[in-house]
Structure formats: structure tokens, C-alpha cells
Design a protein with these regions (language model features):
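Ribokinase/PfkB-type carbohydrate-kinase core domain
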Residues: 1-91, 160-165
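Conserved post-catalytic alpha-helical subdomain immediately downstream of the catalytic base
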Residues: 72-75, 79, 96-163
């Protein structure tokens, strides 16, 4: 955790933005993790991981509580999609397309990496969520955690994203 703290401090000092997907080591030390979150711009976790950070049962409630620690949060919930907040708006996003799931290995990582790729490429938060969902949807149609990863230039269609009040 000390190494992460140093890394985050250095990143902030050079103006870098931080998207963080904590692992079990960080999640098992809630107090230290909460201290690190002040440096994080976007936190992405799955529902079970989020429950190790804050209390709550409903996904929208969990995201609302996480927003007390970070400017933007994304909490994924398997084939139920995700709830995400950019600090201004909160969105519920489902699966990009209704597909036959061959394997779910790598789906969460594909969502996170898809979001990061699109967001760091200058796309809006909402557009990045669509790219993330498309990437994850593509990955679950293949066997293996890397098969199906989409190219940043892939043509995407719109998908419904519900704004939550």
C-alpha cells in the first residue's frame, strides 16, 4: 500500500489522472484504501469489491456512497451491466448487445480497459461507457480473456443508457 501511495502522489505531482481498480490486497485494508482514494479520478470495481469499500445492497446506493471518496465511480454487476457516475450524472448501462455468452472470464477487465482506452482517447464519460460495454460484450462471446477485444476504431451503435436521478 505504501508503494501505491507513493505512485499516486507522484502521478498527482505531474498532473496525471488516475483510474484505479483495486485488487484483493487493497480491498482487504479498507481504511488504507479509503486514504488512497483521495488521489483517484475514476474508481472501477465490481459489486462485490464495492461492498468491501462501502456498505450497501443496491448498486445505485453503493455508487452514491463511493462518490463520497472519488470524483467518478463505475461499479459493474456482471450481466446486469453497471452503474457509473461522472460526478455530475449517474448512469445505468446494460449489455451492449444481447449475445450468447461463451465465457465470462475477462469481462470485467475488458469493461475497465475499454473504458480507460476510450476515456484517455478523449471520448466523453458516456461514450467511454458505451465502448466499455461493447468491449466486454465482445469478449464474452469468445473463449479466453483476450479474445474478442475490440479495436478503438470500431464503429459502434448507440445503446440505451438510463440517467438515474
Amino acid at each position: 500500500m505504501n508503494m501505491l501511495d507513493q505512485l499516486f502522489t507522484k502521478a498527482r505531482s505531474i498532473g496525471a489522472k488516475i483510474m484505479f481498480n483495486p485488487g484483493n490486497l487493497e480491498l482487504d485494508h479498507q481504511r488504507k484504501l479509503l486514504g488512497l482514494l483521495s488521489d483517484v479520478n475514476v474508481l472501477i470495481v465490481n459489486k462485490n469489491e464495492a461492498k468491501k469499500i462501502v456498505q450497501g445492497t443496491m448498486l445505485s446506493e453503493i455508487v452514491a456512497r463511493i462518490k463520497n471518496y472519488v470524483p467518478a465511480a463505475i461499479v459493474t454487476d456482471g450481466n446486469q451491466g453497471a452503474i457509473a457516475s461522472d460526478g455530475q450524472e449517474t448512469y445505468r448501462i446494460g449489455l451492449y448487445e444481447d449475445v450468447i455468452i461463451k465465457a465470462s472470464t475477462g469481462a470485467g477487465d475488458a469493461f475497465g480497459s475499454g473504458f480507460l482506452a476510450a476515456y484517455s482517447d478523449g471520448r466523453s464519460f458516456k461514450e467511454s461507457l458505451i465502448f466499455a460495454s461493447a468491449n466486454s460484450t465482445s469478449v464474452v462471446q469468445k473463449i479466453g480473456s483476450k479474445a474478442g477485444i475490440i479495436n478503438k476504431n470500431v464503429k459502434l451503435h448507440n445503446m440505451p443508457i438510463q440517467e438515474i436521478r
